[in-house]
Amino acid sequence: MAKASFILLGTLFLFGAIASIQAKEDLKEVTHKVYFDVEIDGKSAGRVVIGLFGKAVPKTAENFRALCTGEKGVGKSGKPLHYKGSKFHRIIPSFMIQGGDFTHGNGMGGESIYGQKFADENFKLKHTGPGVLSMANSGEDTNGSQFFITTVTTSWLDGRHVVFGKVVQGMDVVYKIEAEGKQSGTPKSKVVIADSGELPL
């Protein structure tokens, strides 16, 4: 009887562990794919394809997806709610590349599809390595349209910035962008999202 109970408990523990792993994997399930076609000083640098984690952070993922397509039209700022034509305004080697300010172009602006700012959805996903897509902010619950893509592990940002996607193709392009950066963050060249949109899964 005791042996049977031990086997049962062991089986339950195993299933519990598998379920826990599966739950974590589900959070990282790609629900949408979007792209940036990037130009550096007017010359094509290639395409970055990003997978969005819509199950883990649906509101944050939807904001980014819609800003890639431009489907929401013009925002309260009077500017199109669209990443197309916007710059990577802050690039720091061995850290990240930041963009998404389509209203000011210098890191002082941006706008979400929900209005100016929206709350941090959750911090379930972590900054585990290069290619992680996360929301840039100016403090708690100040998400707009600005985002960054990591080029290294940035675990100190966990719990402070909402992770909502990953680069699934084109990390070579991300590294090309990174090479245009300086420790001050000011790019050496003009790095622009020449086009953006959504791709089929």
UniProtKB/Swiss-Prot annotation:
Q: Which UniProt keywords are listed?
A: Chaperone, Cytoplasm, Endoplasmic reticulum, Isomerase, Membrane, Rotamase, Secreted, Signal
Q: InterPro entries, per this entry?
A: Cyclophilin-like_dom_sf, Cyclophilin-type_PPIase, Cyclophilin-type_PPIase_CS, Cyclophilin-type_PPIase_dom
**What are its E.C. numbers?**
5.2.1.8
Compartmental location: Cytoplasm; Membrane; Endoplasmic reticulum; Secreted
**A Gene Ontology molecular function term of the record:** peptidyl-prolyl cis-trans isomerase activity
Record's signal peptide: 1-23
Activity: how regulated: Binds cyclosporin A (CsA). CsA mediates some of its effects via an inhibitory action on PPIase.
Major location category of this protein = cytoplasm
| Regulation: induction | Up-regulated by cold, salt and cytokinin treatment.
**SUPFAM superfamilies, per the entry:** Cyclophilin-like
BP GO annotations: protein folding; regulation of protein refolding
The residue ranges of the PPIase cyclophilin-type domain are: 35-198
Per UniProt, subunit arrangement is:
Interacts with EMB30/GNOM.
Cited function: PPIases accelerate the folding of proteins. It catalyzes the cis-trans isomerization of proline imidic peptide bonds in oligopeptides. May be involved during embryogenesis and organ development by regulating the folding of EMB30/GNOM, and thus, by modulating its activity.
- For this entry, the protein name equals Peptidyl-prolyl cis-trans isomerase CYP19-4
Species source reads Arabidopsis thaliana (Mouse-ear cress)
Gene this protein is translated from? CYP19-4
